[in-house]
C-alpha cells in the first residue's frame, strides 16, 4: 500500500500562511501514521513589474482579512515596499530544490519562508535570502544553491505548476490524500483543524486497513 499526503500550496500565498498551523498539525498527524508529505508548488504569482500602490493596498487589506479569519499574524507595517515585485516563482523553486535534496526536510524550509515573508517582512524573492533560509532548515548552502540554479529543478517547478492546473486546482491551500494512486480531496481552501483532523484521521484508518 502506497499512501501520502499531498499539499498543493505556494510559500507566498496569504491563505497558506493563515493555514500554516493547521497544515503543520496535519502533517504531523500523517507522519505519525507513517504517511509522508509530498509538497506541490502551485505558482501563485509571476509578476514582472513592481506593485502599484493601489494593488499594494488591496493585498494588505486582504492580509488583514486572512488574519481576522485565521488568527495568524501578518506583519503589515513596511511590508511590500516600493519597488517590490510579487513573483512567487523563486520561493516555489526553492522548495522544489529542497524537495530534490531531502523531501522530508523541505517542509521545514516552507515554514521558514512563510515566517520570513509574512512574519518578518523579508524579501523571499531573493535567492540569497532563500539560500540563507535553506541553511537554517538544515540544507548545505552549496548543494541547495546548485539545485536552485539547475535546469532540472526549474523544470520540476514548472511541472508542479502544470500538475496543479491540470488537476483543476484553482486556489490554495489544497490538501489531498493519495492511496495507491487514488486522490481524495481533504480541502480546497482554509478550514480549521477541528474540521480537518477527524477527516484525515478517518482516511488514515482506511488507508491502514486497505
Residues covered by each model-derived region:
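Structural alpha/beta surface segment adjacent to cysteine/selenocysteine redox centers
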Residues: 20-121, 126
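C-terminal cap of thioredoxin/glutaredoxin-like
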Residues: 8-12, 19-29, 112-210
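Short, low-complexity intrinsically disordered segments
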Residues: 13-15, 61, 105, 201
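Alpha-helical structural elements
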Residues: 2, 10-12, 58
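Extreme N-terminal starter segment of soluble prokaryotic enzymes
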Residues: 1-6, 35
Amino acid at each position: 500500500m502506497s499512501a501520502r499526503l499531498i499539499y498543493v500550496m505556494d510559500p507566498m500565498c496569504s491563505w497558506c500562511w493563515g493555514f500554516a498551523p493547521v497544515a503543520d498539525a496535519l502533517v504531523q498527524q500523517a507522519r505519525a501514521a507513517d504517511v509522508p508529505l509530498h509538497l506541490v508548488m502551485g505558482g501563485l504569482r509571476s509578476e514582472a513589474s513592481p506593485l502599484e500602490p493601489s494593488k499594494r493596498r488591496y493585498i494588505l487589506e486582504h492580509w488583514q482579512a486572512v488574519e481576522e479569519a485565521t488568527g495568524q499574524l501578518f506583519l503589515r507595517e513596511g511590508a511590500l515596499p516600493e519597488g517590490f515585485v510579487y513573483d512567487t516563482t523563486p520561493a516555489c523553486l526553492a522548495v522544489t530544490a529542497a524537495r530534490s535534496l531531502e523531501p522530508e526536510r523541505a517542509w521545514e524550509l516552507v515554514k521558514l519562508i512563510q515566517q520570513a515573508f509574512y512574519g518578518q517582512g523579508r524579501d523571499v524573492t531573493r535567492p540569497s535570502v532563500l539560500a540563507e533560509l535553506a541553511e537554517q532548515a538544515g540544507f548545505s548552502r552549496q548543494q541547495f544553491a546548485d539545485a536552485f540554479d539547475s535546469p532540472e529543478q526549474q523544470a520540476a517547478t514548472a511541472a508542479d505548476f502544470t500538475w496543479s492546473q491540470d488537476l483543476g486546482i484553482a486556489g490554495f491551500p489544497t490538501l489531498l490524500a493519495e492511496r495507491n494512486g487514488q486522490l481524495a480531496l481533504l480541502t480546497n481552501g482554509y478550514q480549521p483543524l477541528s474540521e480537518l483532523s477527524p477527516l484525515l484521521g478517518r482516511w488514515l484508518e482506511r488507508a491502514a486497513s486497505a
